[in-house]
Amino acid sequence: IPDPEKIGTLGKMFRFFYSYLIYTSTTKLLATMGTRPDEMPPGSRHLWPFKTFIANTFGRSRFIKTQIIPLVFNAIFDKNHFSVLFDKYHPDAVFLPHMLGWFDNLLLREAKNRGVKTIGMAANWDHIDKYFIPLQADLLLAQNELIKSAAIRDQAYRENRIRLTGYPHFDFIWDKKYLMERSDFLASTHVRLPSGAKYFLYISGSVYCPDEPDVIEEVLNWISAGRFGPDVYMVIRPYLGGRFKDRDFDDNKFAGFAKHPKVRMASRESWKAVEDTIPLLNFMAHAS
C-alpha cells in the first residue's frame, strides 16, 4: 500500500481538496492550532481561510461529494493494490473498520470496482466530522446518534444506509463478571500493592500532553507529603497510541517514574481482545 505521503503532487493536492469539503469545529482546531506539538496543521495553519472556502463552496454540493470525488479518486489512485486478495478469496462483502484511514480508502475503492458489498465504521468518535471521506460504504455502522447525524450532514450519507449499533465494548466494561475482588487485584502481578492501599489512575495523553511529567511529579509530591492519607499510590497507564513514535515518547516521558516507590506502571494492553482489557477494567473500577 503506498504511503499517503508518497502519492505524488497531484494525489496530495486532491487529498487536500477533498479532505476540506467539510469544516467543522474539529476541523477548525486541526487546521489552525493542531493537536500535536510535533506536527503542524496540514499545509500550515495559515491556509485555514482557503480550507473554509473549499467547505463553504464545493463542500455544499452533494453531487460533488458523492459523484465527482469518487470518480476522481478512482482515476488518480488507479492501482489495484488488493487484486491478489480479491482474486483469491472472492469475498461477498468487505468490512472496513477505519473509514478515515488510507488503507481502508484503497480497499473500499477495490471493492466498489468489483461490485463487492461494503460495510464501514468509524474507528473513533471524531472520524466522521473531522475530514471528508472520499468514498462511501454501502452500509455505515454508527455507534451513536451524533455519529449518525454527522454522517448525514458532513459525509452526505442517506439515512437508510446507516445503522445504529451502540458501543458493544461498553457492555463488557459494565459486566461485573470480569471484576476481580479489590484485594485480589491489588495483590496481583498487575499492581502489587498492599491490601488497604488507594491509588490514582493516571491515563496518559502521550504527545498530545508533553508536560504530563510536571503534573505527575506535583501529585507525587502531595502523595509523599501525606496530603491524601497513608498508603496512597499512583498507577500510570501509558498512552496506547497507534504510532511507534508515540509509544517511544511515552517510554521516555515516564522512564523517570518507573522506579518511584509510589508509582506502579500499568501494562499497555490493547482493546483488541477481552483478556487484554480485563486489567484496565479493574484498574478503572478499583481506583480511589
Label for each model-derived stretch:
Residues I1-S25, R247, A255-A258, K262-W271, ...:
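Active-site donor-binding segments of glycosyltransferases and PAPS-dependent sulfotransferases
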Residues F170-S270:
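Conserved catalytic-core segment of nucleotide-activated headgroup transferases in glycan assembly
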Residues I1-F82, K88:
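Conserved N-terminal ligand/cofactor-binding loop architecture of enzyme catalytic domains
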Residues L85-D87, I133, L193, V274-T277, ...:
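Structural alpha-helical scaffold elements that stabilize or flank donor/cofactor-binding regions
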Residues G120, A142, V274-S288:
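A donor-sugar binding/catalytic signature common to diverse glycosyltransferases
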Residues H90-D92, D138, K198, P279-N282, ...:
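Conserved acidic residues
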Residues I69-F73, F77-N80, Y89-A93, P97, ...:
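Active-site-proximal region of nucleotide-activated glycan assembly enzymes
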